[in-house]
């Protein structure tokens, strides 16, 4: 294809031939300037804040690419860019419309071990639910390592055996509540093993089914207690709902359907894949 008449056709050819929005190539095809093309394809393609082509000109992508992925992060970037350059207001407007619907607390599934929940909340839950004595709170702490993706409860064995919450209500004589909480945070089912000697005098570990069943009941009780606790405080609920929506409910799939698009007059040798049709389907509506 040497020439085309419209910006939409140029975009179709660029996507088919180059698999991207190549404004220089589209300019050659149409004889239009890059600025003219950008104007005619407004809301069909978007200039990406902070990204330039190798020749220093603005970098553009199709709407279905730009308005998908982590659209919350993209909106923040566009808002910052628009403060410096008002032409990015169109990005802000489009991304605002593309934001996922905020979920409320009743729609958010919370579980122990979800890494978006700050360890301070886990520690607060632990102290309140297990009635951790104040003098022990310095030595019993919740830690999370992003390097190993492991939760650890430091000082989990420092609680005394006559602690009812730790060894009876939420724990057993074989696994206290802090140990079971640590397993729960690491998404492990609690297991209790006995060490026995076999016929050859060698020690080996065998699962104690009775103690494991009892500990599993305590583990379920801790999980239920956490679900009940996490939303109970209004301020905590508001903070965590906002954090969840910002961090976890932040993406939008590429979903624009351009399968119905045909390009009259375009070179029949050029074929577009379905996602490429989708990318320019919007331009057919303009």
Task: Please give the residue ranges for each predicted region.
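Charged, low-complexity intrinsically disordered regions
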Residues: 1-250
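Conserved pre-motif I regulatory segment
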Residues: 250-284
């Amino acid at each position: 294809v040497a020439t085309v008449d419209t910006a939409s056709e140029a975009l179709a050819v660029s996507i088919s031939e180059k698999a991207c929005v190549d404004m220089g190539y589209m300019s050659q095809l149409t004889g239009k300037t890059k600025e003219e093309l950008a104007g005619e394809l407004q809301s069909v393609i978007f200039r990406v804040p902070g990204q330039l082509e190798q020749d220093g000109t603005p970098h553009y992508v199709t709407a279905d690419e730009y308005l998908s992925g982590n659209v919350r992060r993209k909106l923040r970037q566009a808002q910052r860019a628009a403060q410096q350059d008002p032409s990015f207001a169109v990005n802000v407007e489009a991304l605002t419309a593309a934001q996922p619907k905020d979920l409320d607390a009743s729609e958010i599934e919370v579980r122990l071990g979800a890494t978006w929940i700050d360890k301070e909340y886990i520690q607060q839950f632990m102290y309140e639910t297990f009635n951790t004595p104040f003098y022990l709170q310095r030595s019993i702490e919740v830690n999370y390592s992003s390097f190993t993706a492991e939760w650890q409860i430091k000082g989990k064995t420092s609680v005394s055996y006559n602690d009812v919450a730790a060894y009876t209500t939420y724990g057993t004589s074989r696994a206290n509540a802090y140990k079971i909480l640590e397993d729960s945070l690491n998404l492990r089912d609690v297991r209790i093993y006995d060490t026995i000697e076999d016929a050859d005098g060698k020690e080996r570990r065998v699962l104690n089914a009775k103690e494991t069943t009892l500990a599993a009941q305590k583990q379920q009780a801790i999980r239920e207690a956490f679900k009940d606790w996490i939303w109970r405080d209004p301020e905590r609920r508001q903070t965590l709902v906002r954090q969840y929506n910002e961090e976890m409910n932040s993406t939008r799939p590429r979903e624009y359907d351009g399968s119905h698009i045909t390009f009259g007059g375009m070179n029949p040798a050029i074929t577009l894949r379905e996602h490429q049709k989708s990318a320019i389907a919007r331009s057919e509506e303009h």
